[in-house]
Every structure is written in C-alpha cells, then in structure tokens.
Amino acid sequence: MEISHFFMNGDIKGAIAYMREHEEFKDILPAYVAIFENGEYRRFDVPDKLNEILRLYQIYYRDTFYCGLPEAEAAEKLLAGLKALLNMPDAEEALLTERLHAVFEAEGYHALFGKTQGYYGPYIWRETVPTVYQVGLPGGTAEYTVNILKGFVFRSWMDYLTFGRFGTGGWASPDGTINCIEQAYDFESERFLVSLLKHEAQHTVDMKQFPGITPEELEYRAKLV
C-alpha cells in the first residue's frame, strides 16, 4: 500500500501511522505531527487578517481528516467561524463568499471559494496571466486563451494535506476559459499541449460551430484531435 491511498481517502491518522513505519518519511513526519496531533497550524506569507481566515480552513481540515468530525459538522463550524471573523453572523453563504473574495482582493490576491470533491477549500494566488496559444486542430489552426495562475498561497484541501504533492491542476471558468495552475503543469508536455489544450480548444470550436451539440458529441469529437 502506498501513502497516496491514505490521502485519497482523507485518512490522515492512517497516513501518520504509515509515515512512522517508513524511514523515507522521517523528514516530513514532524510537520504532520505539529499540525494534526498538536494543532500547530501553518502561517502563510499574507497579511494577518488573511492568515486568520486560512487558519479556520486548516482547523476544518484537522476536524474532518484527523479528528473524524462529520464533514457537515466541520463545515458548519467553519462557516460560523468565518461569519464571526468577518462580523456577519447572519449572512447566507453566497454573501459570505462575496465578502471573502473582497477581503482577499483588497490585499491584491485572486481567490476562488467553494468545494472541491466534497470539501471546502480556497484557492488563493497572486497573478493571473492570460496566454494565447495557436492550436493545430483537424479543421485548421485556432487561437485559444489559457489563464496561467501563478504564485499560489493556498490550493485547497488535497494540496494542503499532502504539502503540495497532490492537488488540483486547474479548472474551467463559466465562459469556458481554462485556468491552469503554473506549478501543476509542464507547458511543453504532451499532457498540456494535447491532453488539455487541443482537447479544450476543440470543444470551443465545436460549440461555436454547432450550438446544439451534446456533451457526448463534444467529447467524441475532442478525442479525434
């Protein structure tokens, strides 16, 4: 069994026990003990107010993945803490999210909130760089813009649990623009140039040419590139 099994299942107690039995984890083990066994949370290179917010997310991760608190209860505790910190105790979640955005953006950071694979976790980064690629497709060359996201401070729960070993590589905006986290990609690799870029560019071309196209047809056509 590999340690990734524990992370994918959100089993930090199991991961720590595994690390204690395997010499190759001796350097990283103290960091896990500090956070999850001792509740000594990480501080990030951001203003104190933002660190206070990120600390609440870290407590949520410890509650959920180490202490065994049901996610719904941990989430309720997280949201209550955020509302108290931002002095908006009766706010709906949508309004709370807007306020969180504003707080981070006021300090010069980009932010995305919500859940990834069932768990809360913010994405906080410093710079968005729109980059235009010329993509060769079966029907000709198409321009496709990708947002390269740089200078990540926080990359949601899987990145946090694994100290960056695993984590989200990016996401699509509502308008179809792909956002790629710089540290997650080799931008000269086949994984990026073919598996992601050509695939998504073909989707964009097809949606413009065939407005009524089904998701199944989109995927079929993208597999042909």
Question: Could you say what each language-model-derived stretch is?
Answer:
Residues 1-110:
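N-terminal low-structure segments adjacent to metalloprotease catalytic domains
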Residues 129, 182-184, 202, 209-210:
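Short, flexible loop/turn elements at secondary-structure junctions
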Residues 79, 122-123, 179-181, 224:
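Ordered hydrophobic segments in well-structured contexts
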Residues 194-208:
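Active-site recognition of the HExxH zinc-binding catalytic motif
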Residues 1, 83, 168, 190-197:
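Mature, well-folded catalytic/scaffold domains that follow N-terminal targeting or propeptide regions
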Residues 178-196, 213:
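Short pre-active-site segment immediately N-terminal to the catalytic Zn-binding motif
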Residues 101-179, 186-187:
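Auxiliary, metal-adjacent structural segments of Zn-dependent hydrolase domains
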Residues 15, 20, 24, 214-225:
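Post-HExxH zinc-binding segment in Zn-dependent metallohydrolases
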